[in-house]
Amino acid sequence: MNNSVDFGGRPFHFIGIGGIGMSALAYVLAKRQLPVSGSDLRPNHITRKLESIGTHIFSRQEASNLEFFGSKVSSTEIELNTQEMFPVGKSTLPQVVCSTAINSNNLEYQAAIELGCPILHRSDVLAALINDYHSVAVAGTHGKTTTSSMIGYMLLEAGLDPTIIVGGEVNAWEGNARLGQSSYLVAEADESDGSLVKHAPEIGIITNIELDHPDHYDTLEEVVDIFQTFAKGCKTLIGSVDCETVRELLRNASGDRQQPTITYSLHQDTEADYTVTNIDYRADGTTALVWEKGKALGVLKLKLLSRHNLSNALAAVAVGRLVGLEFGEIAKGIAGFEGARRRFEFRGEVDGITFIDDYAHHPSEIRATLAAARLQARPGQRVVAIFQPHRYSRTLTFLEEFSESFSHADLVVLTDIYSAGEPNLGLISGENLAEKIAQEHPQVVYQPTLSTVCEYLLKNLRPGDLALFLGAGNLNQAIPEIITTLCAPATATL
């Protein structure tokens, strides 16, 4: 692929523009008044939002889509903004952007090669944007979306007006991206396909490192290599020493680095730069006293409940201090942050049943999310975990770990595996996982489809239950159906 990105006015065409990562980039480029088009076979609210700001989106993927901007220029009905976009002699063949999910037999991808269009990976565009700004890039196996969103919100509330690109939707800016007018950029940096190595931000954060994405990585060592390369490219590196792998990476990198390294921890008995004491988990959130290099800064309050979100907040504190914010400004921003969608997101309450949607799909994420649910649950309240496994490769690789991840749930309801495009080789199924979990947890029910999940929950959820829908697939589509059905004889709080 061609790694050179042209922000000078040459069009961009995104293959699969409706994806969460692709759409965020397309949004920022379109808001920068660059010509953007894209295609997606499954139009959604994200593509409709892009269309509302002038992005042309095709619902079919065809070679002719790449000639859209050329036809606009040659048309006798040229709009004024099109003339401005394409001065005389400017190439109208687009830069074609794709993600790892797009394979080489895609019609638009093949057409791009034949036409000689520059072909960019999604990460190339993000890397170029990171280089264009005073940038903060958040990396890590878990917590990227929440941490980057929290930092973005904190800087926004402090008046720094950042550009923000994250892997989830945030109500504060009604989407997964916003274009700011300042020189600051906050971005989520994805490690899933190895492209993390392309990013060289001014401030880089590593929240934690675990083996995940077994479709791309065979060993933890391979994952660590990617993060080590990322770390070397950061002018300032921030890392959580509560993760043993991050701690080891920082230790090994310290001798090679001329740049500052900043650490944070939930344990004051470490030598971390930022720590906390007096942690208090309440139904309405979390409070803690924050320390900076042994000096008390003040009390931090979060609307989010859990240890992992407090850790994410410490990363935000470190960033805030680096960019010159007073602790009061930092605390105000973090206190107002309500989280990202599908990250322990409240979806409704009816008949005393609370519905929560969470993206957790790795064993560690499930454990942390259910632990947070148990903290929030009232005495006697059941925690019901409804889980849709994501990818055959992940389910097979972490079969043992998944079986040990549901100890905080009173009842586990399991669906079949959401393939995310992977072929079913017959090596693992949702039913196999249910049987494995049942060895550790006596209350496990297997319901293979969304319709059978809905039927089961409508019959078996009780008033007072805390129902958590877990997974990165489409399980959350069942929530509105269940709430609507329950609402027939009752009144829901949405």
Swiss-Prot record:
Compartments (UniProt record): Cytoplasm
Any one GO biological process: cell wall organization
One of the record's GO molecular function terms: ATP binding
Stored InterPro entries: Mur-like_cat_sf (IPR036565), Mur_ligase_C (IPR004101), Mur_ligase_C_dom_sf (IPR036615), Mur_ligase_cen (IPR013221), Mur_ligase_N (IPR000713), MurCDEF_pg_biosynth (IPR050061), UDP-N-AcMur_Ala_ligase_MurC (IPR005758)
GO cellular component term of the entry, any: cytoplasm
EC number(s) per entry: 6.3.2.8
Pfam hit, one: Mur_ligase_M
Key words of the record: ATP-binding, Cell cycle, Cell division, Cell shape, Cell wall biogenesis/degradation, Cytoplasm, Ligase, Nucleotide-binding, Peptidoglycan synthesis
Keyword Cell cycle set for record: yes
Keyword rRNA-binding: no
Function: Cell wall formation.
Family of the protein in this entry: Belongs to the MurCDEF family.
Protein name per Swiss-Prot or TrEMBL: UDP-N-acetylmuramate--L-alanine ligase
